Protein backbone atom coordinates (compact mmCIF):
# COMPACT_ATOMS: atom_id res chain seq x y z
CA UNK A 1 0.00 0.00 0.00
CA UNK A 2 3.01 2.33 0.19
CA UNK A 3 3.31 2.53 -3.57
CA UNK A 4 7.05 2.08 -3.29
CA UNK A 5 7.49 -1.68 -2.84
CA UNK A 6 5.53 -4.89 -3.48
CA UNK A 7 2.93 -5.81 -0.89
CA UNK A 8 3.12 -9.50 -1.75
CA UNK A 9 6.24 -11.41 -2.76
CA UNK A 10 7.17 -15.02 -3.41
CA UNK A 11 9.91 -16.49 -1.20
CA UNK A 12 11.56 -19.85 -1.02
CA UNK A 13 11.00 -21.60 2.28
CA UNK A 14 14.66 -21.26 3.17
CA UNK A 15 14.40 -17.45 3.07
CA UNK A 16 11.50 -17.00 5.49
CA UNK A 17 13.51 -16.86 8.72
CA UNK A 18 16.01 -14.46 7.17
CA UNK A 19 13.24 -12.18 5.93
CA UNK A 20 11.52 -12.15 9.32
CA UNK A 21 14.75 -11.44 11.19
CA UNK A 22 15.34 -8.45 8.89
CA UNK A 23 11.80 -7.11 9.43
CA UNK A 24 10.87 -7.61 5.79
CA UNK A 25 7.60 -9.43 6.50
CA UNK A 26 4.56 -8.80 8.68
CA UNK A 27 2.51 -11.50 10.44
CA UNK A 28 -0.61 -12.57 8.60
CA UNK A 29 -2.52 -14.07 11.53
CA UNK A 30 -4.93 -11.16 12.10
CA UNK A 31 -5.36 -10.54 8.38
CA UNK A 32 -6.32 -14.17 7.80
CA UNK A 33 -8.57 -14.37 10.86
CA UNK A 34 -10.55 -11.33 9.69
CA UNK A 35 -11.07 -12.74 6.19
CA UNK A 36 -13.33 -15.79 5.77
CA UNK A 37 -11.94 -16.60 2.33
CA UNK A 38 -8.33 -16.51 3.55
CA UNK A 39 -9.26 -18.54 6.62
CA UNK A 40 -10.81 -21.21 4.41
CA UNK A 41 -7.72 -21.12 2.19
CA UNK A 42 -5.39 -21.57 5.14
CA UNK A 43 -7.40 -24.53 6.42
CA UNK A 44 -6.75 -26.37 3.14
CA UNK A 45 -3.03 -26.62 3.86
CA UNK A 46 -1.40 -29.43 5.80
CA UNK A 47 -0.07 -28.14 9.15
CA UNK A 48 3.44 -29.29 8.19
CA UNK A 49 3.42 -26.89 5.21
CA UNK A 50 2.33 -23.96 7.36
CA UNK A 51 5.05 -24.68 9.91
CA UNK A 52 7.67 -23.65 7.37
CA UNK A 53 6.15 -20.17 7.19
CA UNK A 54 5.69 -19.82 10.95
CA UNK A 55 8.26 -17.98 13.07
CA UNK A 56 7.81 -17.48 16.81
CA UNK A 57 4.21 -18.72 16.56
CA UNK A 58 3.31 -16.14 13.89
CA UNK A 59 2.39 -17.03 10.31
CA UNK A 60 4.18 -15.00 7.64
CA UNK A 61 3.07 -16.66 4.42
CA UNK A 62 0.97 -19.25 2.63
CA UNK A 63 2.51 -21.81 0.26
CA UNK A 64 1.85 -21.38 -3.46
CA UNK A 65 3.39 -24.74 -4.24
CA UNK A 66 5.52 -27.45 -2.75
CA UNK A 67 8.46 -29.51 -3.94
CA UNK A 68 9.36 -32.62 -1.99
CA UNK A 69 12.88 -33.86 -2.61
CA UNK A 70 12.95 -37.56 -3.45
CA UNK A 71 15.46 -39.96 -4.94
CA UNK A 72 14.65 -40.91 -8.53
CA UNK A 73 16.11 -44.18 -9.77
CA UNK A 74 16.56 -45.85 -13.14
CA UNK A 75 14.51 -49.05 -13.02
CA UNK A 76 16.38 -50.68 -15.90
CA UNK A 77 19.74 -50.22 -14.20
CA UNK A 78 18.41 -51.80 -11.02
CA UNK A 79 17.04 -54.71 -13.04
CA UNK A 80 20.33 -55.21 -14.88
CA UNK A 81 22.24 -55.18 -11.58
CA UNK A 82 19.83 -57.66 -10.02
CA UNK A 83 18.87 -55.20 -7.29
CA UNK A 84 15.48 -54.77 -5.70
CA UNK A 85 13.94 -51.33 -6.01
CA UNK A 86 14.55 -49.20 -2.90
CA UNK A 87 11.79 -48.82 -0.35
CA UNK A 88 10.75 -45.89 1.84
CA UNK A 89 12.62 -45.92 5.12
CA UNK A 90 15.95 -47.05 3.68
CA UNK A 91 19.08 -45.76 5.37
CA UNK A 92 22.17 -43.83 4.32
CA UNK A 93 24.21 -47.03 4.52
CA UNK A 94 21.75 -48.91 2.33
CA UNK A 95 21.75 -46.02 -0.12
CA UNK A 96 25.54 -45.97 -0.39
CA UNK A 97 25.71 -49.75 -0.77
CA UNK A 98 23.12 -49.60 -3.55
CA UNK A 99 24.86 -46.71 -5.33
CA UNK A 100 28.17 -48.56 -5.16
CA UNK A 101 26.67 -51.66 -6.76
CA UNK A 102 25.19 -49.56 -9.57
CA UNK A 103 28.51 -47.87 -10.35
CA UNK A 104 30.39 -49.27 -13.35
CA UNK A 105 32.34 -48.03 -16.36
CA UNK A 106 30.64 -44.91 -17.66
CA UNK A 107 27.83 -45.04 -15.10
CA UNK A 108 27.69 -43.48 -11.64
CA UNK A 109 25.47 -44.71 -8.86
CA UNK A 110 24.39 -41.22 -7.80
CA UNK A 111 24.89 -37.57 -8.67
CA UNK A 112 24.58 -34.65 -6.25
CA UNK A 113 25.01 -31.23 -7.88
CA UNK A 114 26.22 -28.66 -5.34
CA UNK A 115 22.99 -26.73 -4.97
CA UNK A 116 21.08 -25.89 -1.81
CA UNK A 117 18.15 -28.12 -2.67
CA UNK A 118 20.38 -31.08 -3.45
CA UNK A 119 22.34 -30.85 -0.21
CA UNK A 120 19.65 -29.86 2.28
CA UNK A 121 17.97 -33.31 2.48
CA UNK A 122 21.23 -34.86 3.65
CA UNK A 123 21.57 -32.76 6.76
CA UNK A 124 17.79 -32.60 7.26
CA UNK A 125 17.69 -36.39 7.51
CA UNK A 126 20.54 -36.14 10.02
CA UNK A 127 18.66 -33.74 12.32
CA UNK A 128 20.83 -30.77 11.31
CA UNK A 129 20.47 -27.35 9.68
CA UNK A 130 22.73 -24.55 8.44
CA UNK A 131 21.42 -22.07 11.02
CA UNK A 132 20.07 -22.36 14.54
CA UNK A 133 16.43 -22.10 15.51
CA UNK A 134 16.81 -18.33 15.94
CA UNK A 135 17.39 -18.07 12.19
CA UNK A 136 20.66 -16.20 12.73
CA UNK A 137 23.30 -18.39 14.39
CA UNK A 138 25.42 -20.34 11.85
CA UNK A 139 25.65 -24.06 12.56
CA UNK A 140 27.64 -25.17 9.53
CA UNK A 141 30.25 -26.82 11.75
CA UNK A 142 27.71 -28.84 13.71
CA UNK A 143 28.19 -32.59 13.95
CA UNK A 144 25.17 -33.34 11.75
CA UNK A 145 26.32 -31.07 8.92
CA UNK A 146 29.91 -32.32 9.01
CA UNK A 147 28.74 -35.93 9.00
CA UNK A 148 26.51 -35.32 5.96
CA UNK A 149 29.28 -33.57 4.03
CA UNK A 150 31.76 -36.32 4.89
CA UNK A 151 29.26 -38.92 3.68
CA UNK A 152 28.86 -37.23 0.29
CA UNK A 153 32.56 -36.47 -0.03
CA UNK A 154 33.33 -40.12 0.62
CA UNK A 155 31.09 -41.24 -2.23
CA UNK A 156 32.75 -38.77 -4.57
CA UNK A 157 36.26 -39.85 -3.56
CA UNK A 158 35.30 -43.49 -4.07
CA UNK A 159 34.09 -42.81 -7.61
CA UNK A 160 30.41 -43.45 -6.87
CA UNK A 161 29.45 -39.89 -7.84
CA UNK A 162 30.74 -37.60 -10.61
CA UNK A 163 32.38 -34.25 -9.93
CA UNK A 164 29.60 -32.29 -8.20
CA UNK A 165 30.32 -28.72 -9.31
CA UNK A 166 30.02 -29.11 -13.09
CA UNK A 167 27.88 -32.26 -13.39
CA UNK A 168 24.32 -31.98 -14.70
CA UNK A 169 22.75 -34.88 -12.87
CA UNK A 170 19.36 -34.54 -14.55
CA UNK A 171 20.80 -34.77 -18.05
CA UNK A 172 23.08 -37.61 -16.99
CA UNK A 173 20.07 -39.46 -15.58
CA UNK A 174 18.15 -39.03 -18.85
CA UNK A 175 21.20 -40.30 -20.76
CA UNK A 176 21.62 -43.39 -18.55
CA UNK A 177 24.90 -42.10 -17.14
CA UNK A 178 23.75 -42.04 -13.53
CA UNK A 179 21.44 -44.50 -11.79
CA UNK A 180 20.01 -42.26 -9.08
CA UNK A 181 19.54 -38.54 -8.58
CA UNK A 182 17.71 -36.33 -6.11
CA UNK A 183 15.06 -33.87 -7.31
CA UNK A 184 11.54 -32.57 -6.89
CA UNK A 185 8.73 -32.73 -9.41
CA UNK A 186 10.19 -29.85 -11.45
CA UNK A 187 12.42 -32.22 -13.41
CA UNK A 188 9.64 -34.45 -14.73
CA UNK A 189 8.79 -32.35 -17.80
CA UNK A 190 12.46 -32.28 -18.79
CA UNK A 191 12.66 -36.05 -18.61
CA UNK A 192 9.39 -36.45 -20.48
CA UNK A 193 10.79 -34.27 -23.26
CA UNK A 194 13.86 -36.54 -23.28
CA UNK A 195 11.62 -39.55 -23.92
CA UNK A 196 11.55 -41.08 -20.44
CA UNK A 197 8.34 -42.69 -19.20
CA UNK A 198 7.11 -44.23 -15.96
CA UNK A 199 8.46 -47.53 -17.23
CA UNK A 200 11.98 -46.11 -17.08
CA UNK A 201 12.14 -44.64 -13.59
CA UNK A 202 10.44 -44.33 -10.22
CA UNK A 203 11.07 -42.48 -6.98
CA UNK A 204 11.52 -43.25 -3.29
CA UNK A 205 11.75 -41.21 -0.12
CA UNK A 206 15.13 -39.75 0.80
CA UNK A 207 17.22 -42.18 2.86
CA UNK A 208 17.44 -41.50 6.59
CA UNK A 209 20.44 -41.64 8.86
Spans of model-derived segments:
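Bilobed periplasmic-binding protein-like "clamshell/Venus-flytrap" ligand-binding domains
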Residues: 60-61, 103-114
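Hinge/lid segment of periplasmic solute-binding proteins
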Residues: 12-68, 96, 202-204
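Short helix-initiation/N-cap motifs at beta->coil->alpha
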Residues: 1, 14, 90-96, 162-175
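Short glycine- and hydrophobic/aromatic-rich loop-to-beta-strand nucleating segment
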Residues: 70-73
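Paired acidic/hydrophobic, glycine-rich loop segments that form the ligand-binding mouth/hinge
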Residues: 7-10, 179-183
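A ligand-binding cleft/hinge motif common to bilobed small-molecule-binding domains
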Residues: 16-20, 185-198
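Glycine-centered hinge/linker elements that transmit conformational signals in sensory
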Residues: 98-101, 135-164, 205-206
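Early extracytoplasmic/lumenal segment of secretory-pathway proteins
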Residues: 1-16, 105
Amino acid sequence: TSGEAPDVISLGLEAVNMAVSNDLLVPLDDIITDDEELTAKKDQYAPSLLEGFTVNDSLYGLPNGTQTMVVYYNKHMFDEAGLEYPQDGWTWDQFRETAEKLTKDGVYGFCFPCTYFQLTPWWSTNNAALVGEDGETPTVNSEGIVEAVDFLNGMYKDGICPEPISSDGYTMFANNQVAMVGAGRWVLNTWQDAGLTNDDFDCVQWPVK
